[in-house]
């Protein structure tokens, strides 16, 4: 523990402060700003030679600025002789561009970012609820992907919901939703979205009986909130008594807050992997949980060369 040092950029300093409080160590001193032309500038204000350095920096909006802060900081620590550099990226931006669809001339941006982080000398990466698990394979360095589900499950249990059912908002999220349902010992529902004909709106098929149930939609992130709001509407139309949504990453871009406020969703519960905007904080239907204890425990285990997977057994 004596060699561990934790630093942060400007992406989510509040989370970093919460993590170091859990670890009972001070937050490292680094200055991260911009030159007059907008270039990122960074300077480490204390000795890091031989230290086990952790940089807490989600690559949320402004995505490119936060990514460049992480890259430039990592280079500064490498040139300052840190013994090991771990990038703690609670929310990994560019994760949605992880494949090249057939006949599409697009970049695989997740791979580009993985290469950038590796080439600047980062030794390992710690993420929370990667959008696609296969992104770990884009790196040539160790990647530990931990889960936000324990925090979400604990809160669900504390709420003492009656007649509870976990629902996946789409087919792609079934594995995640099934794991939460299994942890809670409750039923699983699935929403199957399909477009019956071209130029026709999507039809939502509900797999499972939601009549009179308290339904909880589970997903890794909420972006514009369109999927969750449409899912909540479909569930209510099929007789659900209450509909809540639990998501790890509150990206909440575009008209997300407006969509949530106009929806029939009773509450959206998120973690603090991404800081909430002022509008999100003012929305009485959004509640934020603290994921710092989970991140701090993972950091401690990495520093002490202990098992990460043992956290989730």
UniProtKB/Swiss-Prot annotation:
InterPro entries the record matches: PRib_PP_synth_CS, Pribosyltran_N, PRibTrfase_dom, PRTase-like, Rib-P_diPkinase, Rib-P_diPkinase_bac
Cofactor: Mg(2+)
Pfam families on file: Pribosyl_synth, Pribosyltran_N
Residues involved in ATP binding: 37-39, 96-97
Keyword terms of this UniProt record: ATP-binding, Cytoplasm, Kinase, Magnesium, Metal-binding, Nucleotide biosynthesis, Nucleotide-binding, Transferase
Molecular function terms, GO-annotated: ATP binding; kinase activity; magnesium ion binding; ribose phosphate diphosphokinase activity
Biological processes, Gene Ontology terms: 5-phosphoribose 1-diphosphate biosynthetic process; purine nucleotide biosynthetic process; ribonucleoside monophosphate biosynthetic process
Catalytic reaction list: D-ribose 5-phosphate + ATP = 5-phospho-alpha-D-ribose 1-diphosphate + AMP + H(+)
Active-site residue numbers: 193
Cellular compartments per GO CC: cytoplasm; ribose phosphate diphosphokinase complex
UniProt keyword Cytoplasm present: yes
SMART domains membership: Pribosyltran_N
Enzyme class: transferase
Principal location class: cytoplasm
Subcellular location(s) per record: Cytoplasm
Free-text function comment from the UniProt entry: Involved in the biosynthesis of the central metabolite phospho-alpha-D-ribosyl-1-pyrophosphate (PRPP) via the transfer of pyrophosphoryl group from ATP to 1-hydroxyl of ribose-5-phosphate (Rib-5-P).
Family named by the database record: Belongs to the ribose-phosphate pyrophosphokinase family. Class I subfamily.
Listed name of the protein: Ribose-phosphate pyrophosphokinase
Naturally occurring in which organism (per UniProt): Pseudomonas putida (strain ATCC 47054 / DSM 6125 / CFBP 8728 / NCIMB 11950 / KT2440)
